[in-house]
Amino acid sequence: MALHDAEIVRTMGCGIAGLSIVADSLAAIKYAKVYPIRDETGLVVDYRTEGDFPTYGNDDDRADDIAATVVHTVMDKIRAIPMYRDAIPTQSVLTITSNVVYGKATGSFPSGHEKGTPFAPGANPENGIDTHGMVASMLSVGKLDYNDALDGISLTNTITPQGLGRSKEEQIQNLVGILDAGFVPDDSCAYDGTKGY
């Protein structure tokens, strides 16, 4: 007990799954024409979407602002709920594998996401929808307010060394450049090859 804090701070963690699909679907409703398709009982079972709409993960403020608004609105709703033992409510956008399970149990969306297919993990753009590259998706995720997701926000990317360049020096320089573009607001921390890092 000697290592316990004198005053215990409790948190209650909640999470968002499918953020990119919700953002893209709301963008489709706002910028395109979306028609619900109903079954014989009147239940909406699919959508027909006509026209173009911006998508989250491409550094397009129209879609990225929708995603940020969703995260903020959900967190505001959570904050309004009294928490057990005065816990501090928190939220995450960082599914690990649950995005697959949730997607398999969910219907179609106005964005074109098909029934029964996995959601993108965490704050990633919808699978196959990001067309402007890794840096654009990093910039989109960077528009989410961390104060609304204190449990964490994840963006999963995969790069092979060969995809970064031919020589080790080129690979290091390109990787640092990608990270700088996504995380450094100016060039004050830009890569300097003379420093050996």
Residue ranges and their predicted role:
Residues 1-197:
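Acidic, glycine-enriched catalytic cores built around paired aspartates
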